[in-house]
């Protein structure tokens, strides 16, 4: 009986040995010891082995050691800045050479007068035209002077009549005498060019001022407005300027300015409206020299 049991055990051991050799044992994977191994992964053969006959597992290979990190290269050393080179010593400024004594200026040589070149024909014609224009202007001025000397006396008497009426003086012309004066004055103003009417008005004003000066210097003489038919056709004036008055023909004196402005305003109000003529506006602000208005 015992032998039978021994034989049976040997047969079982032999069969288990053959199966153990044929079946590869799986290599155990390294696991964290803290985690439990699953129960279903152990082969059935190992569970049938008897104690004392368990096969030893091959030794586990050690984990590869991590390669050490390469040692860090040391940082490059900063190169020091180059030291500035010292400036070279400045050279002294060159001394200016001493001034040489000034040479005397050359004496200017006397220049002989150059002979005048003959005037060209074109320049001669231009000079001749200028002379002709000047002669024409002088002739026009002479004609205007004659008109002012002989023909503006009626305008003087008309303005003087208005001046006497304004100041309530006794020397007032009658209506039969005043109307012909108006007609003669307007006829003469119409003949005077527009650019010369301002001068004509100023001459009328100056004639009135001279007339009043003569009356003040000769109170006993008979200086009065006479009949137009006796004086105007011959172009004679009503008064003779006193030879003792050097200012009879000249510019307006400072003491005469108020009187001049008063009579001028009266003339500018009377003559343009009476004769229907245009008088430039600047006549009320300018003062023209007189002396053109002559009396005989």
UniProtKB/Swiss-Prot annotation:
GO terms for molecular function: nutrient reservoir activity. Residues 25-36, 59-71, 81-116 have a biased composition (Pro residues). Residues 242-255 have a biased composition (Polar residues). Residues 24-126, 220-255 are annotated as: Disordered. It comes from the Eukaryota. Pfam families: Tryp_alpha_amyl. Keywords: Allergen, Repeat, Seed storage protein, Signal, Storage protein. The keyword Repeat applies. Residues 1-20 form the signal peptide. InterPro entries: Bifun_inhib/LTP/seed_sf, Bifunc_inhib/LTP/seed_store, Glia_glutenin. Belongs to the gliadin/glutenin family. Gliadin is the major seed storage protein in wheat. PANTHER family: ALPHA_BETA-GLIADIN MM1, PROLAMIN PPROL 14P. This is Alpha/beta-gliadin clone PW1215. It comes from Triticum aestivum (Wheat).
């Amino acid at each position: 009986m015992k032998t039978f049991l021994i034989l049976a055990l040997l047969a079982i051991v032999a069969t288990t040995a053959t199966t153990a050799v044929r079946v590869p044992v799986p290599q155990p994977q390294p696991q964290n010891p803290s985690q439990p191994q699953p129960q279903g992964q152990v082969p059935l053969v190992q569970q049938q082995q008897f104690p004392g006959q368990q096969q030893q597992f091959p030794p586990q290979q050690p984990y590869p050691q991590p390669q050490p990190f390469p040692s860090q290269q040391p940082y490059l050393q900063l190169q020091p800045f180059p030291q500035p080179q010292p400036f070279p010593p400045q050279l002294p400024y060159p001394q200016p050479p001493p001034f040489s004594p000034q040479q005397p200026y050359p004496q200017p040589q006397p220049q002989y007068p150059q002979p005048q070149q003959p005037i060209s024909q074109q320049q001669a014609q231009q000079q001749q035209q200028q002379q002709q224009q000047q002669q024409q202007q002088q002739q026009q001025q002479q004609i205007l002077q004659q008109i002012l000397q002989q023909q503006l006396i009626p305008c003087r008497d008309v303005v003087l009549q208005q001046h006497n009426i304004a100041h309530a003086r006794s020397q007032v012309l009658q209506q039969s005498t005043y109307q012909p004066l108006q007609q003669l004055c307007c006829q003469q103003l119409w003949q005077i060019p527009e650019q010369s009417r301002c001068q004509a008005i100023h001459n009328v004003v100056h004639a009135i001022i001279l007339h009043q000066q003569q009356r003040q210097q000769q109170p006993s003489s008979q200086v009065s407005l006479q009949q137009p038919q006796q004086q105007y056709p011959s172009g004679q004036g009503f008064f003779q300027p006193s030879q003792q008055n050097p200012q009879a023909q000249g510019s307006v004196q400072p003491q005469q300015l108020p009187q001049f402005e008063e009579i001028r305003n009266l003339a500018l109000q009377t003559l343009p409206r009476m004769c229907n003529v245009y008088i430039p506006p600047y006549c009320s602000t300018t003062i023209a020299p007189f002396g053109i208005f002559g009396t005989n």
